[in-house]
């Protein structure tokens, strides 16, 4: 199949610049890049592929993926993006309401993943045999709410869904999106420990949106091609616990202390920026779905044997915090290696110290939610 024939016949879809055309399976884009005789096409394909961490293998075991909370603001676009991932052979979409419509809609996309929708009585079947489970379920942020305000509702949702994962697919890799991630990941870990099926390599909090934002803001400020930019983001996934390491960003750019501080704070407050811009009508659903799809793609490539390094929030000994986001190597069993933080600037050292009280308190809150139940 040619690249041209794979794109919907649409007079508004022209190569190489129309963004509609970018929505192709990553491994297909890489293949097109390799075979194209057009240098412009090759450049376009390479830029599209670099939205993901690294070039995906063109083949690999088809994986069963479940999205829990598939009818929500994040779940719907995430379900579409996972349907487009060529590493997915079976896609289970679960929610307490609205799933049949989402599943029917997504199933019409002409990619190989077979889609099934499940309602509140179908969770066990949705999870059975899954390799990867993504959890965006829960209530979204509203104006004036912090991630911690979501705890009372989302903590119970995550605990109950993770219990089902422990019962029906205990070996699956877990990607937890539901906020507050600083607490919901410890909740997931403690619940799986309680059930005797915890594997620290397979429970990950999705902090990729912080990385995506840091890359975007850094590239914009310094006039760089965002596709060539890398910025590690460590710590947690809320406010001051989000610490972009701009001293380790590539390509290198010289920034004043004022600019550095502004970029850091914008990365930390990115979620609030979107909530306020939507004026009470939503949160960062689209960018979160995009970031979650990037991270899920990396997890799938890791499961299929490709060496992948991503930032994610996991059980860790890198700092005094028992859970911490940093660069990790993903492999066939989940997290294979947790990287050290590397050299930090004085500004970053101060940020690391400042985040600890809040991060530790959020972790303990999650732990006690399960232990005290």
From Swiss-Prot:
Signal peptide: none annotated. Its EC number is 1.1.1.37. It is an enzyme of class 1 (oxidoreductase). It is found in: Mitochondrion matrix. InterPro entries: Lactate/malate_DH_C, Lactate/malate_DH_N, Lactate_DH/Glyco_Ohase_4_C, Malate_DH_AS, Malate_DH_type1, NAD(P)-bd_dom_sf. It comes from the Eukaryota. Homodimer. Its main location: mitochondrion. Substrate binds at residues 141, 147, 179, 213. The active site is at 237 (proton acceptor). GO terms for cellular component: mitochondrial matrix. GO terms for biological process: malate metabolic process; tricarboxylic acid cycle. It catalyses: (S)-malate + NAD(+) = oxaloacetate + NADH + H(+). Belongs to the LDH/MDH superfamily. MDH type 1 family. NAD(+) binds at residues 69-75, 95, 154, 177-179, 288. It holds the Pfam family Ldh_1_C. Keywords: Mitochondrion, NAD, Oxidoreductase, Transit peptide, Tricarboxylic acid cycle. The keyword Mitochondrion applies. This is Malate dehydrogenase, mitochondrial. PANTHER family: MALATE AND LACTATE DEHYDROGENASE, MALATE DEHYDROGENASE. GO terms for molecular function: L-malate dehydrogenase (NAD+) activity. The keyword Iron does not apply.
């Amino acid at each position: 199949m040619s690249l041209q024939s794979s794109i919907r016949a649409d007079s508004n879809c022209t190569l190489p610049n129309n963004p509609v055309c970018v929505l192709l399976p990553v491994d297909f884009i890489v293949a097109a890049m390799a075979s194209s005789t057009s240098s412009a096409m090759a450049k376009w394909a390479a830029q599209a592929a670099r939205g993901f961490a690294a070039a995906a293998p063109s083949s690999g075991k088809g994986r069963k993926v479940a999205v829990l909370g598939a009818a929500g603001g994040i779940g719907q676009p995430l379900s579409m993006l996972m349907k487009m991932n060529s590493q997915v052979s079976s896609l289970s979409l679960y929610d307490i309401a609205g799933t049949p419509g989402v599943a029917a809609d997504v199933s019409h996309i002409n990619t190989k993943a077979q889609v099934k929708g499940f309602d509140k009585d179908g969770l066990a079947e949705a999870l059975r045999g899954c390799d990867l489970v993504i959890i965006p379920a829960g209530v979204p942020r509203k104006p004036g709410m912090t991630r911690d305000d979501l705890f009372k509702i989302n903590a119970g949702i995550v605990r109950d869904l993770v219990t089902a994962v422990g019962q029906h697919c205990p070996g699956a890799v877990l990607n937890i999106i539901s906020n507050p991630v600083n607490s919901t990941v410890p909740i997931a870990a403690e619940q799986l420990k309680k059930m005797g099926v915890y594997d620290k390599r397979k429970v990950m909090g999705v902090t990729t949106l912080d990385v995506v934002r840091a890359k975007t803001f850094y590239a914009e400020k310094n006039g760089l091609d965002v596709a060539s930019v890398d910025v590690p983001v460590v710590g947690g996934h809320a406010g001051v616990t989000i610490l972009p390491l701009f001293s380790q960003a590539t390509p290198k750019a010289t920034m004043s202390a004022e600019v550095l501080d502004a970029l850091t704070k914008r990365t930390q407050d990115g979620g609030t920026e979107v909530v306020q811009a939507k004026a009470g009508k939503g949160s960062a659903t689209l960018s979160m779905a995009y970031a979650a799809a990037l991270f899920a793609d990396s997890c799938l490539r890791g499961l299929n044997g490709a060496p992948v390094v991503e930032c994610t929030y996991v059980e860790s000994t890198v700092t005094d915090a028992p859970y911490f986001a940093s660069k990790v190597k993903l492999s066939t069993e989940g997290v294979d290696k947790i990287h050290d933080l590397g050299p930090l600037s004085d500004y970053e050292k101060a940020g690391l110290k400042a985040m600890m009280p809040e991060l530790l308190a959020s972790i303990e809150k999650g732990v006690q939610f399960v232990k005290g139940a």
